[in-house]
Amino acid sequence: MKVFVIPYYLWFGYVIIPVMYLFFKSREEYWRAFIFLSTGMTVFLIVSTIWPNGHDLRPAYLLGDDLCTNLIRSLYKTDTPTNLWPSIHVYNSLGVHFAIIRSDLLKDKKWIHNGSLILCLSIIASTMLIKQHSVFDVMTAVLMSIVMYYLIYNRDVVTTYRANREAKKARIRY
């Protein structure tokens, strides 16, 4: 399934474009997405520092000289199979998808919601199909994203933090 290298590379734009859109259009929604993504990346860096990890799932040789095979070869050369757990591709893809579907700015744009879901699931599948991540890497990233979804969107830690900060400022003034 070497064609799945394409959604793997699309991940970069999939993360950057919606985050930049939210930055310019809705600071509150941007901060939710930012906290979601940066928390996951921080956890990833801490885990990788404390417990370096990797896998040996990749094939020894890749046959073929087509575009997708060459993209996979390039990926294998530049992105070693180390420090993979939990999968940042999976976690950030889910984080961006959650930001899109929970955005007030995009609530009436079902075609964006559907396109985001398809790309998100394609990216998640790609991480395993091109042998970049194991099922364990993917499932732990999914679990992490579920926990963060609850904190960011159900508990709304951003609004709670702002309210507490404003209350503290008000107490200091009086």
Regions found by a protein language model. Name each.
Residues 1-15:
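Interfacial helix-start motif at the membrane-water boundary
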Residues 9, 13, 37, 41-45, ...:
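Alpha-helical transmembrane spans of integral membrane proteins, capturing the lipid-embedded, hydrophobic core
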Residues 14-18, 94-99, 118-126:
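Hydrophobic, membrane-inserted alpha-helices
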Residues 24-108, 159-174:
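Membrane-interface loops
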Residues 41-49, 118-128:
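Aromatic-anchored segments of alpha-helical transmembrane domains
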Residues 61-62, 81-85, 122-149:
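Interfacial helix-loop-helix junctions of multi-pass membrane proteins
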Residues 97-102, 145-153:
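Hydrophobic transmembrane alpha-helices
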Residues 108-121:
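Short hydrophobic alpha-helices at membrane interfaces in multi-pass membrane enzymes
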